[in-house]
Amino acid sequence: MAKSYEYLHEFFEDVCNIEDRDKRIVFVKENAFKQAKTILQLCYNDKIKLDLPIGKPPYRPCPEGRTPSSLANAFKPIGMTVKGNKVRRLKKEKVFIGILESIHEDDANLLVAAKDGNITTFQKKKYSKITKSLVEAALPELLK
C-alpha cells in the first residue's frame, strides 16, 4: 500500500534512507505520487525543461506557522513554465515564484534544484541516491 506524503522532501528523504538499491526501486514504484514524478521528470527527462533562468529566484519562503498549499494545488500551474509554452518569460517567472512561495521551504529548494537538474548535488548531496538510473529502473515512462 502506497504511503501518503504531505511534502515532497519527505518522500525523497525516505527514498534516500533505503540502503538497498533494489528496495529503493520498489519503494519509488509503489510510492511516487504525481508531484514527485514531476520533480523526477524535471531533473532527468531531457525533453522537459522549464523556461526559467538557472539558480534560485528571489522569493519569500512560506512563513513559519502558515500552512503551505497542498502540492496538488501548488503544482497545477507548473506547465505554464515549460519551454515551448507561449506564455511570456516574465509571466513564467512570476508563476514559478508563486509556486515556490506557496509550498514548504524544503520543497521549494527541491523544486529549484530539479529545475536546474542538480538534485543529486545540492544541499550537501542530501538526495544523491536519487539518480537517473534509479528513475530509469523504477519509472522508465517518466524519461520517454
Task: Describe the role of every protein-language-model region.
Residues 1-144:
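N-terminal nucleic-acid-engaging modules of covalent nucleotidyltransferase systems
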